[in-house]
């Protein structure tokens, strides 16, 4: 893994910082695990914008990732590591002993040729997936399930991990990167180690066009708009003279947005600001 600063051969290259990984596969992805991915432009089925700042971008195929890791007792060999345009983490193509291939999130330190396994009998090593009741307290894990059998939902982006800090009967207590402490059923699965490609956060796109390649459109300040477009719009000068709000008039600085009281009992400590 190398961090490369580009030479300033043009204004668009002057500030570019790339993360180069020579171990990534340079050919095409494994076709049976690809799906077509159509662009939504941030619109829902009514054609209305539900997510702003989305549109355009390069065509992509979706890679079918095995977040469940439920192929127990069958060892698999890592064939290669690959780039995935749909996520910040890299992925690994693994070949199981029965001939099936699957994509998984590539943990830190995983290399082609290594062997991994899932299930209660799996060894305690990076890349193996097993129920958290079988993982030692203090271990760092990723791709953590929130409901048994649903598939990993926590700690899936580049460099992410969760630490198991306690085990109490049917639940384990996890410390998330945000500082939140949360209880989850000990039957839920997790993959040992942390997600690889942690250097992803060091990259610098260098120009607006690089964001457009990724399907990200510009973010315009409300105070730069007209009154018809935003509550902050209009007026002379830059002051909008009111508490900051969203385009729909909802307070935006420090307002609580969590409404899922049903799962509050599982949160031992709130995330630190």
UniProtKB/Swiss-Prot annotation:
PROSITE patterns: RIBOSOMAL_L2. Signal peptide: none annotated. Transmembrane segments: none annotated. GO terms for biological process: cytoplasmic translation. One of its GO terms (molecular function) is rRNA binding. Keywords: Ribonucleoprotein, Ribosomal protein, RNA-binding, rRNA-binding. GO terms for cellular component: large ribosomal subunit. It holds the Pfam family Ribosomal_L2_C. Residues 221-273 are annotated as: Disordered. One of the primary rRNA binding proteins. Required for association of the 30S and 50S subunits to form the 70S ribosome, for tRNA binding and peptide bond formation. It has been suggested to have peptidyltransferase activity; this is somewhat controversial. Makes several contacts with the 16S rRNA in the 70S ribosome. Part of the 50S ribosomal subunit. Forms a bridge to the 30S subunit in the 70S ribosome. NCBIfam families: rplB_bact (TIGR01171). Belongs to the universal ribosomal protein uL2 family. This is Large ribosomal subunit protein uL2. The lineage of its organism: Bacteria, Pseudomonadati, Pseudomonadota, Gammaproteobacteria, Enterobacterales. The gene is rplB.
């Amino acid at each position: 893994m190398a961090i490369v600063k580009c030479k300033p051969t043009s204004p668009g290259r002057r500030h570019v910082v790339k993360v180069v990984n020579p171990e990534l596969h340079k050919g095409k992805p494994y076709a049976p695990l690809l799906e077509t991915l159509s662009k939504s432009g941030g619109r829902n089925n009514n054609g209305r914008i539900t997510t702003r700042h989305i549109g355009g971008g390069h065509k992509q195929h979706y890679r079918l990732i095995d977040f469940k890791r439920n192929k127990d007792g069958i060892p698999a060999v890592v064939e290669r590591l690959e780039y995935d345009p749909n996520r910040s983490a890299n992925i690994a193509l693994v070949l199981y002993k029965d001939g099936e291939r699957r994509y998984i999130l590539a943990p830190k330190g995983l290399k082609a040729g290594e062997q991994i396994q899932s299930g209660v009998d799996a060894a305690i090593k990076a890349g193996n997936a097993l129920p958290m009741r079988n993982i030692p307290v203090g271990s760092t894990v990723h791709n953590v399930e929130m409901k048994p059998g649903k598939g990993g939902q926590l700690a899936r982006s580049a460099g992410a991990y969760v630490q198991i800090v306690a085990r109490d009967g049917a639940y384990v207590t996890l410390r998330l990167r945000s500082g939140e402490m949360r209880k989850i059923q000990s039957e839920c699965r997790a993959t040992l180690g942390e997600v690889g490609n942690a250097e992803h956060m060091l990259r610098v796109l260098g120009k607006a066009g690089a964001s457009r390649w990724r399907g990200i459109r510009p973010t315009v300040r409300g105070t730069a708009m007209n009154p018809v477009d935003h509550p902050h719009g209009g007026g002379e000068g830059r002051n909008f003279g009111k508490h900051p709000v969203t385009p729909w008039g909802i307070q935006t600085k420090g307002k609580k947005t969590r409404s899922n009281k049903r799962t509050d009992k599982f949160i031992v400590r709130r995330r630190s600001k």
